[in-house]
Amino acid sequence: MKLKNLLLIVLVSAVLCACHSNYQPTTLTVASYNLRNANGSDSARGNGWGQRYPVIAQIVQYHDFDIFGTQECFLHQLKDMKKALPGYDYIGVGRDDGKEKGEHSAIFYRTDKFDIIEKGDFWLSETPDVPSKGWDAVLPRICSWGHFKCKDTGFEVS
């Protein structure tokens, strides 16, 4: 009986050792940030876009976000963020024309860490493939999405 138990332990150990892989867990630091549109009245109160975006960039750099989503961001704000964050790029289109006009729900990602496998945008409406308002919305609502692959590990995330 003792010999059978010993053989069983050796067999199980051998199987477990054979199953060992080089899998390394991937840590992913993500965030979502409502940047708030560049509203002129905010500047009068001291928290305009010109005051906010350097602080936002510092927060992103401090936390070393791999990927972060944005809301309420116009094209010029995206350009400011990209300039303030070398090593990041973004995906996403404007909600008004599917190109550059209107607010974006862009996704920033670290270009040294990720490749884009696939990306897209859709509108929250009855016609999700074209810029449009849905149901009871006052303005068009857009969703941007991306499928990324980690350059080092091959890990994929959407």
Predicted feature residues:
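N-terminal, active-site-proximal structural segment of metallo-dependent hydrolase catalytic domains
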Residues: 7, 18-85, 95-103
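Sec-dependent N-terminal signal peptides
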Residues: 5-14
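Structured beta-strand-rich core segments of catalytic domains in phosphoester-bond hydrolases
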Residues: 67-158
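N-terminal secretory signal peptides that target proteins for export/translocation
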Residues: 1-2
